């Protein structure tokens, strides 16, 4: 996310891209959704989930349109550079050469589509992978670019804090209990406090912090180096994730089918909407990774339809996961990390399955943590980078990795309330990335495209929400969400 134009990579079919996008969106946020559903009530949760899914789809089409406009501008600049080079090389050309060049220059002054020969690619074809940072540099002024990177950095800090808390929290829940020897995990009516004993004199919070320290020592050093997620590791973690989700849904359905469901969720409870909103926004987050995902798709003819199909499938999956959870488990017994509800012997008889589900977040999150950390570090470098300048070795190799790693670890040290961490990250930084940035990107790219190519040029990847009303509506919704969440937090604190 350093904001550069990067290699497109190996091409894949549109349906493979659909699967990749599904895997990208459905992540850690899905594991915190059941508790948020139970807290806010099933009807309010369903309505908000569908509406936020629709809003995420709208801004996803905005980003795709901006990607196409960025590709067209890059092609136009390459044509201009080529013309300048040809002008320099032909300064001593004959009169006939001059005549040919004059004709070419007159053609260059027409809109770009008029100089496209038959069979040449559409100027708005998405072939160059232009990351969001580069699009911000193309369409925003300096203040806008800095605000973009600030928003991305805050979101990535929240991401790392969630990851840093989720792994030790899962390990603590699996290995600790009130008595210290209960291998079946959390019982239905058991409420644990951080001060309860874990092993001998060690409290649960002590075990959590020990696991956090081990997690930081093992994965923190990767922040100081370059690391990327390999194809095979991605396949392995995706396979583990879908096995875990499938097992949880099936187990919950079996209990409900056998009339063992304990959940009686309310219809609506507006006190839980704040966290639900943040969790849902976080769970639909994909806009910042769309360039890496969409560009390698070989055929983009029906791209918008495929993206819409993906969102429908994701909505159905989130609904199935959350509704089976809230009707299978009592609302007060649902854990921040849904997998931990299956650590009970009366839910899962096989110890291997209990430990797999309990430790599943540990494996998947541990593979993502170094990637997110390196991405955040690179964004810090890009934010402070000056043209032609280089960083001293200490700043480049020590300062930037340190300011990347320390804050999220400190947040995780202070709290392991995953629902609140996900809610706040989604409600603030998530709102900026998912709503504000795409809306401003598409607004400025449309204006620049009209100036550069004329009114008659059509962007083949233009969003179906092409009226300016939708840009204003998205920004108004983002502002309303910011006010609502902030007011809700303030009112909640004053009641304590």
Curated annotation (Swiss-Prot):
Keyword ATP-binding attached: no
Family stated for the protein in its record: Belongs to the TMEM104 family.
Record key words, sorted: Glycoprotein, Membrane, Transmembrane, Transmembrane helix
Glycosylated position list: 193
Extracellular topology ranges: 32-36, 168-204, 255-276, 328-354, 419-421, 492-496
Topological type in the membrane: Multi-pass membrane protein
Intrachain S-S bonds: none
Subcellular location, principal: membrane
Protein name listed in UniProt: Transmembrane protein 104
Subcellular locations according to the entry: Membrane
Cytoplasmic side: 1-10, 58-146, 226-233, 298-306, 376-397, 443-470
Naturally occurring in which organism (per UniProt): Pongo abelii (Sumatran orangutan)
GO cellular component: membrane
Source domain of life: Eukaryota
InterPro entries according to UniProt: AA_transpt_TM
Transmembrane portions of the chain: 11-31, 37-57, 147-167, 205-225, 234-254, 277-297, 307-327, 355-375, 398-418, 422-442, 471-491
Lineage: Eukaryota, Metazoa, Chordata, Craniata, Vertebrata
